[in-house]
Design a protein with these regions (language model features):
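Conserved ABC ATPase signature
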Residues: 130-134
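Helix-to-loop junction immediately C-terminal to a conserved catalytic motif
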Residues: 50
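Conserved ABC transporter NBD signature motif
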Residues: 58-65, 78, 111-112, 118, ...
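The feature captures the beta-strand-to-loop junction immediately N-terminal to the Walker
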Residues: 35-37
Length: 241
C-alpha cells in the first residue's frame, strides 16, 4: 500500500531551485534511504514534504490524499512527522513534556506515552529530566519519540546520526530497527553514512543537484554504483534498479 506518493516535485529557496522534478513512492512499513552530498537538495526535500517549505509545482499525496497545499501543522495531524536535523527540542522542558506536547497536536492512534517508552526504553529513566541536559544520543531518541507521539503514517528522519558517537549511533539504529520491524509506518531517512544507509534501507535514492540520480534496492545497485552517483560520476538522468 502506497503511503506517500511524490510526483514531479519542484521546490527551492527564492530564486534557487533545490529540488528538481523529483518523483518516488514509499510503501507502508518500507524504509527509503535518501543519500547525496551536501547541497544535493535532501533537506529542502524533507522540509517540503513536511510542509515547512512550499512546493513550486508537483504533488505530494499521503495515503491517497493530496496534501501539497496543506500547512505543516495540518500535515502532522494527517500523519507526516519529521525528526529534523539538530533535533529542535524544547530544551527547557522535560522529556515527558516534550512527548506530551507532540501527543496533543498529532493524530490519535497506537502511539501513546507507554508504547513510545516500550519502543524507546532509553527514555524511561529520563522522563523527568530537562531535555537541555541530555547527551546527543539521548536527545535524538527524544526527538524520535516526540515524532512517534503524533502517530505518523510517514516518519521523516533527517541526518539522524549527525554528531553522535559511534556507540550512540549503534543504539539509535537498534531502536529504529525495532520501529521498522513493526511494519506499520513508512520511514524516509537521510543518512550520510553510505554503509549504514545501504544496510538499513529497503530502497535508496541518491540525489544530485536536486534530482534523483540513482534509485533502487541497495543490494541490486551495489556500493560502487551508489558511490559514483553520490559524487556525480554517473549520467544525471535517474537510473532505477
Amino acid at each position: 500500500m502506497t503511503m506517500l506518493a511524490v510526483n514531479n516535485l519542484i521546490a527551492g529557496h527564492g530564486l534557487l531551485t533545490a529540488v528538481r522534478d523529483v518523483s518516488f513512492d514509499v510503501e507502508a512499513g518500507e524504509v527509503l534511504g535518501v543519500i547525496g552530498a551536501n547541497g544535493a537538495g535532501k533537506t529542502t526535500l524533507f522540509r517540503t514534504l513536511a510542509g515547512v517549505h512550499s512546493a513550486n509545482s508537483g504533488s505530494i499525496a499521503l495515503d491517497g490524499v493530496d496534501v501539497t497545499a496543506l500547512s505543516a501543522s495540518r500535515r502532522v495531524a494527517g500523519g507526516i512527522a519529521m525528526v529534523p536535523e539538530g533535533r529542535r527540542l524544547f530544551v527547557d522542558m522535560t522529556v515527558r513534556e516534550n512527548l506530551q506536547v507532540a501527543g496533543e497536536n498529532g493524530r490519535s492512534g497506537a502511539w501513546t506515552l507507554s508504547t513510545v517508552l516500550a519502543a524507546l526504553p532509553v527514555l524511561t529513566s529520563l522522563l523527568n529530566v530537562v531535555t537541555g541536559g541530555l547527551s546527543g544520543g539521548q536527545r535524538q531518541a527524544v526527538a524520535i519519540g516526540r515524532a512517534l507521539m503524533s502517530n505518523p503514517k510517514v516518519l521523516l528522519l533527517d541526518e539522524v546520526s549527525l554528531g553522535l558517537s559511534p556507540v550512540a549511533i549503534e543504539g539509535l539504529y537498534e531502536q529504529l530497527a525495532g520501529l521498522k520491524g513493526r511494519g506499520d509506518t513508512a520511514m524516509i531517512v537521510v543518512e550520510q553514512d553510505l554503509d549504514r544507509a545501504m544496510a538499513f534501507s529497503d530502497r535508496v535514492i541518491c540525489m544530485l543537484e536536486g534530482r534523483i540520480a540513482l534509485e533502487g534496492r541497495p543490494r541490486v545497485l551495489g556500493k560502487p554504483a551508489i558511490t559514483e552517483a553520490y559524487f556525480g560520476l554517473t549520467h544525471p538522468e535517474s537510473t532505477h534498479a
